Every structure is written in structure tokens, then in C-alpha cells.
């Protein structure tokens, strides 16, 4: 899109947002143009907290469907819009509610800690929700004699098992972006840029995490890079975060690792996140849809597990 078109659309979006008393929340994995127009940018935990405290009449969530669902669960009387309702999540899709409910029935005595990257229905069948930045803190509060069932990300679960020295029952889900990085490409890049810090999201497989200098949530990765100006960084997460990293560390250099199939680094963009565009954002503010709606019973059940997260963090 031409710069002049971006400016024009951005102006219209700001006008519509003010006119409708709307707040625009955007995840770090959104396109830079959307990040720049948002009222608030953050990771899943930060966006959840912002959704819980907003006084706006309308919440426009520039992220994926499960994130907009969380905003609706927290604010059942507010209108929640998602620029593209098809913006799903491969990780959330890897754990369907029917199978998860049966899985829970097989492990009735377990405490179910579910990653926020999950559907409202799965959250409804869970005890506690967590994010990548809050998971360790939550797990450490569970009594040692209680078995934990962790879903849906097996790589995040494995990372947390090592961090907490706590064996858990793991659901075998994965994120299509974080499991796609090539270890060979990473090692080659580390050789070429031997002074670079390797920063990884814990949704990455262990063969990538073991090469990393720092592992954390998107916000934690952002903080790490901001505290080390004029440095080099190899990034093992969705490349949308680099837009904010460059803003906070303009003198630093950031590298993106290619994918397993040898494809271009642009394959590390989440295709679901990128379904949201400035044009769709403008249209949803103008028309008041697509709107996220939820079954009341499911929403109330899911809110209990989200409230447990907020209480423990």
C-alpha cells in the first residue's frame, strides 16, 4: 500500500474510533501499519488486562479470534469487533473442545492449566488460564501433590516442565510459526553473526531453545532487546515484534531465521494474524461488524478460569 493511502486510512480510522468511542487493541504480531494506529499494543496478558479495564463502548481487537473472545468474555455487555473473523490460530485449532473435554474426564483429579491460545469452549473446561509470561508463576502456586494437565502447546509445556521441575501431562498442540524455524539456519546465522543474542519464544521446539540466550514472552523479548542498545539479535518468534524492537532500539540490528523447508523469512509471519488489514479495520469501525458473539453459559464458565489467572498474577 502506498504511503499516502496508509496516511489517509489511518486518519479515517482515528476519526471513526473517536466517533464510536472505540478502543483499538493490537497484538505485537500485527502488521506495522496496524500497530502504529492502535491505542494499545501488547502481548496476550497485557491485552487481556487492557480489555478488562477499558471504558470504551466498543473494543476493536486486531489479533486472532481467541483474543477477541477473551475481550468479549471479560466484557460481555460491550461490542467486540474483529476486522476478519477468519483470523484463527493453528495452536488453538489443535485442541478442539470435544476432545479436550474427554481428555479432562480421563484426568479428573488434575488441575487443568490452559494456555490463552485456546478457544472459549476449551477455556470453559479449564481450571486456570495462563499466558507465556504468567505460566511459570501460576504453576509454582499449584501444590506439589496435584498433577497438572497443560494444554494446548507441548513445547511451551516442555519448557515450563524444565523451568519449574514439574512433570505435567501435556496436550500435543503446536504453533505453526514457532515450530517452523530451521535449526540449521539458526546455527548458520549464529556463525555469521557471532555477537548476536538469540531471543526465542517458548512456543519454539527444544532444539531451538537450547541455542537461545534468552527465552520469554513477546513483551519479555522486547524488554531484553531494549535494555541492550546497539546490539545484534536473532529473533525466534513471529517477526511482527521486530517493528517495536526497532522503535525502542533504533541502533540495533535484527535477524529473522528461515523456515525448515528453506523458504523465505517472510514465512515466519503468522498468516492468521495478517488477515487483519487497515482496510478491514476501517470497514469494521464504519459498519460495526464483524462482531464476536459467544454462548452465555460458555462465556461464564470461561470467565471463571480467566479470573483465576488474574487472581494468581
Curated annotation (Swiss-Prot):
Record localization: Cytoplasm
Enzyme Commission number(s) of this protein: 2.5.1.72
Pathway named in the protein's UniProt entry: Cofactor biosynthesis; NAD(+) biosynthesis; quinolinate from iminoaspartate: step 1/1
Cofactor: [4Fe-4S] cluster
Chain positions recorded as iminosuccinate binding sites: 27, 44, 115-117, 132, 201-203, 218
SUPFAM superfamilies, A to Z: NadA-like
Primary location group: cytoplasm
Classification via Pfam families: NadA (PF02445)
Keywords recorded for this protein, A-Z: 4Fe-4S, Cytoplasm, Iron, Iron-sulfur, Metal-binding, Pyridine nucleotide biosynthesis, Transferase
Superkingdom per UniProt: Bacteria
Cofactor: record remark: Binds 1 [4Fe-4S] cluster per subunit.
BP GO annotations: 'de novo' NAD biosynthetic process from L-aspartate
Sequence similarity: Belongs to the quinolinate synthase family. Type 2 subfamily.
Protein's name according to its UniProt entry: Quinolinate synthase
Recorded name of the encoding gene: nadA
